[in-house]
Design a protein with these regions (language model features):
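C-terminal substrate-binding/active-site "lid" region of AdoMet-derived donor-dependent transferases
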Residues: 102-150
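An accessory alpha-helical subdomain
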Residues: 152-224
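Glycine-rich SAM-binding Motif I of class I
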Residues: 28, 32
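Conserved S-adenosyl-L-methionine
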Residues: 36-42
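Conserved class I S-adenosyl-L-methionine
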Residues: 17-26
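S-adenosyl-L-methionine
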Residues: 54-82
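Conserved alpha-helix/loop element of class I SAM-dependent methyltransferases that forms part
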Residues: 2-17
Length: 224
């Protein structure tokens, strides 16, 4: 099966571990990657939708039969073993991801791909003692943010000092900007300008956002 750029980007952030869980697994491609590469001993795939979970069950049927994968239909982390070492949560809103973690448990390692509210997710992780070791944006049709976070005691991850700008735009994006991230900034500037052009009055919040994005873009393109 040919994995999409999005799936490949997520897989690239998954580290070897003993136990792995894919929450909101959809087709189960990331779990397949972990198992095919012998990157985990066992895995749990979960989804709140039995229909979506069945896709992963079909893809991973041989591993399920062999006892290496356990499929569970549940909300969030409800039926995920609390000793799970690494958890992937991708394709959900940032608020939903934070709710799942608040109501569940905090695993040693997380790979997250929030669809919205990524700055809030960054702050949430830092407040709970995680070191965010990867934080970048890529494009696969849409723009996606990916975060890899670990507790420092897990594998010796070193916390990185986050500024307000890092929280808003992403630590790695600001230090090693990809063409995809620069495209995102250009697109966001166009959207802000279009909103301001269509507005009948001043929109201070949009003007302030445009100024922040423009400043970041100018800083990054001067240094590229």
């Amino acid at each position: 099966m040919k994995r999409t750029k999005r799936i490949r980007a997520l897989c690239a952030e998954l580290a070897p571990c003993v136990t792995f869980a894919d929450v909101g697994c959809d087709h189960g491609y990331c779990t397949q990657y972990m198992l095919e590469g012998n990157l985990c001993r066992s895995a749990v795939v979960s989804d709140i939708s039995a229909g979506s979970l069945s896709k992963a069950e079909t893809l991973l049927s041989a591993y399920i039969a062999g006892g290496r994968v356990t499929p569970v239909c549940c909300a969030g982390l409800d039926k995920i073993p609390q000793d799970t070492e690494q958890v992937l949560i991708a394709g959900m809103g940032g608020e939903e991801i934070m709710t799942i973690l608040r109501e569940g448990f905090l695993p040693p390692a997380l790979v997250l791909q929030p669809m919205r509210h990524t700055p809030k997710v960054r702050a949430f992780l830092l407040e709970r003692g995680y070191a965010i070791v990867r934080d970048f944006t890529f494009r696969d049709g849409k723009f996606y943010d990916v975060l890899r976070a670990e507790f420092p005691w897990y594998r010796g991850a070193q916390p990185r000092g986050y500024t307000e700008r890092d929280l808003e735009f992403g630590y790695d994006n600001l230090r090693s900007p990809s063409p995809d991230f620069l495209e995102l900034l250009q697109e966001e500037m166009r959207k802000c300008r279009a909103r301001l052009a269509a507005a009948q009055t001043s929109v201070p919040a949009v003007e302030a956002r445009l100024n922040r994005i423009t400043e970041v873009y100018d800083d990054l393109t001067r240094s590229v």
